[in-house]
């Protein structure tokens, strides 16, 4: 697995600084965005907000993100976060009314933000290594005639995504377990529930619990929990 220059502890410390600024504080979307921006800009992360309507609770926020490799300055690898090339999108009910996030919803948001940024930073590290070694990028190739289901299979089976989602699975389990407990739980991966790790369950549902793809994913997730 790829080792990010940004450690888990750095992300946790930044989220710890954010918590008292937003939990039980009525804030508009732009105020929440500014609080996250202050912490994550130095890591090369742009924070945006996106209103999603009734599918998101009025006082809830969720997160998504992506790494934009085309915005990477390949000549500046000595300072890899000088360029903003990861977007953290905060998804909320609307941007016109204050949002008051309670502690329970904060714990959910914190996990999603940590998982999202870590996931995209793994992709950034992959991109850096690939450019240095091979001088270019590679992405999953989708045939125009593929169904959405088949495109999802191609996406999930891409080695870069397996690396990043293995880290997601480890972070999922660490929400409720210690490292040792999470490692032991993952050894019995066929018993893990949707609530414990949605992405692991999707991989098992998509490829089968005894597939090579799932075995590779599990090996990487277990290695992550050993560190």
Report each predicted region and the residues it spans.
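Proteolytic processing junctions in secreted/extracellular precursors
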Residues: 3, 11-12, 20
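Zn2+-dependent metallopeptidase catalytic core
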Residues: 21-46
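Extended non-catalytic scaffold regions that mediate assembly and binding
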Residues: 55-63
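Active-site scaffold of zinc-dependent metalloenzymes
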Residues: 62-111, 124-128
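Acidic, low-complexity, intrinsically disordered interaction modules
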Residues: 111, 115-116, 128, 173, ...
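Post-HEXXH active-site segment of zinc metalloproteases
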Residues: 111, 127-156
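Active-site recognition of the HExxH zinc-binding catalytic motif
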Residues: 115-128, 164
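Long, well-structured alpha-helical subdomains associated
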Residues: 148-227
